[in-house]
Each structure stands twice: as C-alpha cells, then as structure tokens.
Amino acid sequence: MKTLLLTLVVVTIVCLDLGYTRKCLNTPLPLIYTTCPIGQDKCVKMTIKKLPSKYDVIRGCIDICPKSSADVEVLCCDTNKCNK
C-alpha cells in the first residue's frame, strides 16, 4: 500500500511539473539570474552595437523573440541560463 501511495505521489509531481519557470541570466556573471514571470518562457541576449565603444549587452526574459537589426543582434534560447 505504501509503495502504491509513493508511486502516485511521484507520478503527480512529474505530471504537474510543480513550480517550473524559466531562469535567465540578467548579468554577464553566471551566478546572477532571474526567475522569469509567467508567459515569458525564453531567455534573450541583445547586443547593441555602438560606435566607437564596445557593445552593451542586455540579458533577461522575453515572451516573443524580436528580429535582429543592423544596430541590435538578438539571440533567444529556450533552456535555463542559456543566454550567456
């Protein structure tokens, strides 16, 4: 009986996937990340090209990945902390 109850609990947790949300980096440091709000299930890294200085990088969560342009390179991904 205990085995059946334990099996049901494990199956319930696996099926419900309790508390899962995407985690994305929001700084260049790999240990600092943010938990994305509901609906924002992609991580993004935007590189803004400024001359003559180097690139400014924006990282975080996003719902829809925008297209890259001549001034902004956009990289989107679908796994945790993938926007390095």
Curated annotation (Swiss-Prot):
Negative results: does not affect blood coagulation and does not show significant hemolytic activity. InterPro entries: Cytotoxin_Cobra, Snake_3FTx, Snake_toxin-like_sf, Snake_toxin_con_site, Toxin_cobra-type. GO terms for molecular function: toxin activity. The keyword Magnesium does not apply. Belongs to the three-finger toxin family. Short-chain subfamily. Aminergic toxin sub-subfamily. CDD domains: TFP_snake_toxin (cd00206). Expressed by the venom gland. Acts as a beta-blocker by binding to beta-1 and beta-2 adrenergic receptors (ADRB1 and ADRB2). It dose-dependently decreases the heart rate (bradycardia), whereas conventional cardiotoxins increases it. At 100 mg/kg, intraperitoneal injection into mice provokes labored breathing, impaired locomotion, lack of response to external stimuli, and death (after 30 minutes). It is found in: Secreted. Disulfide bonds join C24-C43, C36-C61, C65-C76, C77-C82. GO terms for cellular component: extracellular region. Keywords: Cardiotoxin, Disulfide bond, G-protein coupled receptor impairing toxin, Secreted, Signal, Toxin. Residues 1-21 form the signal peptide. This is Beta-cardiotoxin CTX27.
